[in-house]
A protein has these predicted regions:
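Ferredoxin-like alpha/beta domains used as RNA- or RNAP-binding modules
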Residues: 2-17, 36-138
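Short beta-strands and strand-coil junctions in structured, solvent-facing domains, enriched
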Residues: 29-30, 52
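Residues located in well-ordered beta-strands
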Residues: 32-34
Length: 138
C-alpha cells in the first residue's frame, strides 16, 4: 500500500484494513471506526480514536461496512490511526454522504417535541393543499 491517505470508493465493500465501519451493536453503536486488523473470518480489530470507539475486537455481524477506505498499515497503533483518519478527511466524507444525512434526519425526527410534530403535520397539510390546487389548475 502507498503511504498516502486517500479516501476512495470501492465497487465492492470488502473487509480490508483501512475500511471504515459503522458500529451497529454495543456501547459504541452509531459511531464510526476503522478496521485495523483482520482476526479471522468473522472478527476484526477496530479502532475509532476520533469518534470515541475504543480499540476492540468486533464481530462482523455487529458492524456495517461503509464505502469509505483509507490507507492504513496492518496493526497500526491508535495514534497512527488518528493521524491517518484526520489526514484522509474521513469525518468530512462521512458527513457529506447520504447515509449520514439519513441517519441525522432520523435522529432529528425522533427528537421532535409534541408541538414540533404538530407543526410538521400542519406544513404537510399546507403542502398537500398546494399540490392538489396546482394539479387541479393544470
Amino acid at each position: 500500500m502507498s503511504s498516502e491517505s486517500i479516501v476512495k470508493n470501492s465497487q465492492w465493500r470488502l473487509v480490508e484494513v483501512g475500511r471504515v465501519v459503522l458500529v451497529k451493536k454495543g456501547p459504541s453503536a452509531g459511531k464510526l471506526a476503522a478496521i485495523v486488523e483482520i482476526i479471522d473470518q468473522s472478527r476484526v480489530l477496530i479502532d475509532g480514536p476520533e469518534t470515541g470507539v475504543p480499540r476492540q475486537s468486533a464481530n462482523l455481524g455487529h458492524v456495517v461496512l461503509t464505502p469509505l477506505t483509507f490507507a492504513l498499515p496492518r496493526g497500526s497503533r491508535t495514534s497512527v490511526v488518528a493521524k491517518k483518519w484526520t489526514s484522509a478527511g474521513v469525518a468530512e466524507k462521512w458527513a457529506a454522504s447520504s447515509w449520514a444525512k439519513k441517519i441525522a434526519q432520523r435522529e432529528r425526527r425522533a427528537a421532535l417535541s409534541d408541538f414540533e410534530r404538530f407543526q410538521v403535520m400542519v406544513l404537510k397539510k399546507q403542502k398537500r393543499y398546494a399540490v392538489k390546487k396546482a394539479v387541479a389548475k393544470a
